[in-house]
Structure formats: C-alpha cells, structure tokens
Amino acid sequence: AVLKDGSCGSIGYGIATAYAKEGANLVITGRNVKKLEAAKQELESLYGIKVLTVQADVCAGCDNEATVANVVKQAVDTFGGIQVLINNAQASASGVPLAEHTTEQFDLAIYSGLYAAFYYMKACYPYLAESHGSVINFASGAGLFGNFGQSAYAAAKEGIRGMSRVAATEWGKDGINVNVVCPLAWTAKLEQFRDAYPDAFKANVKMPPMGHYGNAETEIGRVCVQLAMPDFKYMSGETLTLEGGMGQRP
C-alpha cells in the first residue's frame, strides 16, 4: 500500500490520483473527515482500488506518536504492508515576517511538517525495510531560497530535507530510497496565500520559465510515482525541484 500523510489538498490529491491510476491501494490521512471520505469514494469508483482513510493530525500538545502508530497499524492490518510513504502534510502562517512570528505559529509549521514526517518515517520503517520501499518527502523553495515571510515554513521544510538525507544514509542497507520533492503548482492553498498575504505572494511567487504552474497530478504526482519505481531505486538522498525551471540551484 501507499501511505500518504496529507491527501485532501490539491497537490496531495493529485499524487493520490497518480498512484491510483497505477492500481496502487492507498492509505490517506488528513484532518477533514468529509474531504477524506469524498476522496475515497471518487478514487475507488474511478480507478477500482481500495482506499483506507484515517483522520489524523500531528500537532503541539497531542499524543502524536500514538496517533501515527494507529494510522500505520490500520494500514498494515488492512493491506498487509507498506511499500511507499509520502509525507506531504504541512500547515504554516506563511507571509508573517520572522520578527513577528509567534511561538504558536512556529510550532504549527514544525509539528505539522517536520514532526509529522519524523513520526511517520519512524513508524513505517520496519515495513518499508521489509518491502524495500520508498519514502518521498515534500520540501519547498521557501527553504532553498529563503523566501520572505516563510521562516517557520522554511525551517520545517529544511529540517525535512536534512532528515531525509540522514535516512537515505541509514536506510540504504535496507533497500529503502528516500528523496525530496519541492513542487510548484497552482492550488487552492496558493490562492489563499495570495489573498491573505499579497506582499509575500508578490515577493515569492513568479511565473516559471516554462510559462505555467505545475499540474498537481501529471507534473507532480507522476514524478512521485516514478520515484518509487525500480528504475529510480539507485537515486536516494536527492532533492528534486519541480518548479518549471524556477528552482535552479548550483
């Protein structure tokens, strides 16, 4: 099964759709039960797969280890194992300058992103080792390029990148490859960011050289499918920027 943390957003659903079209059974998590159930019904009816939905949220002050352990147990009990783990969930107060950030806003980003990836990777490790599986974590150009107003978000994402590189080193012996994707796609969340923080949006979001924003399924999700395929098994510890030519680095 493919376990996806954070599947109701535009990019998350695009990834789920790409895997569903390959015939993969899915475990999808999120906070909104109605959105999870709607996603389950649509994916199962369109693609003939099985989808397990589990309401789960990693947050400050919660028993996060128990929450994640419950998700993983349900996944294994339902499907017998886990072949792919995708950590896509993230919440943050993007647009708030560092000096104005509150501890609560910082915790929101770190718990929903970095801690969530940590708990899921730790809990899924035995099953990924058994299946010689793949981990695909999500980061962002916010951390790569120091985007204005995104200090907590960037901190969470760069923490995920560092942890992913360590996992690639430690888990290579188990046949697990671990990679990171930094996407740019036009989504409802990006629209909300534009409306809530117009100055930060203008400073950070440009039209990519390719002339369009990425499609969540075909240009982000399909790459995630390939990263778990045998042809890409030897690639591990890498960061891929799927930003239409905007995420160029030395």
Residue map of PLM features:
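Catalytic Tyr-x(3-8)-Lys segment
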Residues: 57-59, 198-218
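Short, small/polar-rich loop/turn modules that mediate ligand/substrate recognition or access, typified
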Residues: 172, 177, 235-237
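Substrate-binding pocket helix/loop in short-chain dehydrogenase/reductase
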Residues: 96-98, 102-107, 201-204
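Short C-terminal tail/terminal secondary-structure segment
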Residues: 95, 145, 206-207, 224, ...
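Residue(s) in the substrate-gating loop at a strand-loop-helix junction
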Residues: 140
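Canonical Rossmann dinucleotide-binding motif of NAD(H)/NADP(H)-dependent dehydrogenases/reductases
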Residues: 1-27
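Active-site helix of classical SDR
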Residues: 121, 156, 164
